[in-house]
Regions:
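Short loop/turn segments that flank or connect secondary-structure elements
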Residues: 58-163, 172-185
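N-terminal cysteine/histidine-rich coordination modules
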Residues: 1-56, 61
Length: 185
């Protein structure tokens, strides 16, 4: 969006984790406020109208009607953890939150590089986005403790990773599917 730039592009103005988005990872989007390739966004326009606040929760009018229904459906990333992620970033401090976000991004890149059979990108993105960091660390440790996977075909490696991630999600009753927005009308 013209005139909208931010120094922190990994964690968006509205609280979404751009660092874990497939569009950002693939180089198709620079992240929130990252310059060329950024999509038009009503929330970014609102930020400009309110003095360019770095994050919406720093605006005195937050939460505002712009967020009505915002978390009801997903885009390239799940929206359902957005408010929880904002709370965590404010509680831990942005620097600590961003360090954890970078660790999640590294885990996601590892899954995509070593366990993606060409059909699991959305699943891995969603799982890393929604699962707590400690669960992701456990899954990666379990995968790393299975050297026989290195000798197996991509499909078998992918299935092993999917199984462990799904088990972690099931233990927490987390659905690893993106939610579609209900159609208006």
């Amino acid at each position: 969006m013209k005139g909208f730039t931010r120094t922190e592009t990994r964690f968006s103005l509205c609280g979404l984790n751009c660092a874990l988005c497939s569009m950002h990872l693939g180089g198709y989007c620079p992240g929130c406020g990252g310059g060329a390739g950024n999509q038009s966004c009503a929330i970014a326009k609102c930020s400009l109208e309110h003095g360019g606040v770095p994050f919406c929760w720093e605006c005195p009018e937050y939460p505002c009607p712009r967020y009505d229904g915002f978390d009801d459906g997903d885009s390239f990333v799940p929206h359902r953890n957005r408010q929880q992620d904002i709370a965590q970033a404010t509680e831990l401090g942005l620097d600590v939150y961003l360090m954890q976000l970078e660790e999640k991004r590294n885990i996601l890149e590892g899954l995509l590089a070593h366990y993606n059979d060409g059909h699991r990108k959305t699943f891995f993105n969603t799982a890393v986005y929604l699962l707590p960091l400690e669960d992701l660390r456990s899954v990666m440790a379990a995968l790393n403790n299975r050297p026989e996977l290195d000798e197996q075909a991509g499909k078998e490696r992918a299935l092993a990773a999917v199984e462990l991630l799904q088990e972690a999600a099931d233990r927490r009753s987390i659905s690893l599917k993106l939610n579609k927005k209900a159609k208006k009308g």
